[in-house]
């Protein structure tokens, strides 16, 4: 995962440097790197920070031939904290670009604030649908994806496989809604239930009990990071493999596999390429 992150962050950094038309050759390029470094969600943010630091080491601490400073900040996966940090990065630190941002609800919280300040905003992960297409801004660039894309692949796969009905589950925030919207765009079978869980939830016993009662032939789940680890482990402990086939996006991936180990066996998923998969 580090190799993958380094390539991504190096690309982001290099692209950003090319757009700093208002930075003189003598100036230091300042990058505000906002990610989640605390709590259960810190598993992904720590990987992003490690990748950025390794990329800067490979680049000799420079971007576009200029000295560069990367300021890391912890958004705590809280929109209000993200807004405060964005304000600090823009007004106090006077960064040339804000990047990072894992969570789509945080990207939605800071998007207008950053882009309207004429600061470049580059997403390393979050790709909420409202800021794509007609909602795209000239000061925003995404180096990852638009949230709907990966689940669209799973929706098509399950439609082509002839799966007649499915139970849906996702966290109740922007990316969760985008994921299920993307899935339903290509899957045309029966939706038995569409369940939204709390963002950051760690106990899924109530949801698994309801799912067991519904006994769907297939279940499609988006639960990223630590949520995915907890969900998959509890799914296994509850013996849910005998109840329903599990299909996922970002629940079983390079971030969660080290913790899941054999608990991931049996889950099917669509995913962007990773050396871990």
Tell me the role of every PLM-derived stretch.
Residues 13-21:
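Bacterial N-terminal signal peptides
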Residues 43-48, 58, 62-131, 143, ...:
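Beta-alpha junction/loop-to-helix N-cap segments that form part of ligand/metal-binding clefts
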Residues 3-12:
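Bacterial N-terminal signal peptides that target proteins for export
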Residues 234-277:
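Extracellular/periplasmic periplasmic-binding protein-like sensory domains
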Residues 5, 20-26:
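Sec/Tat signal peptide C-region and signal peptidase I cleavage site
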Residues 33, 89, 93-102, 122-124, ...:
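Periplasmic-binding protein-like
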Residues 84, 129-132, 138-238, 277:
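Extracellular/periplasmic Venus flytrap/periplasmic-binding protein
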Residues 32-51, 73-80, 102-103, 169-177, ...:
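Extracytoplasmic "Venus flytrap"
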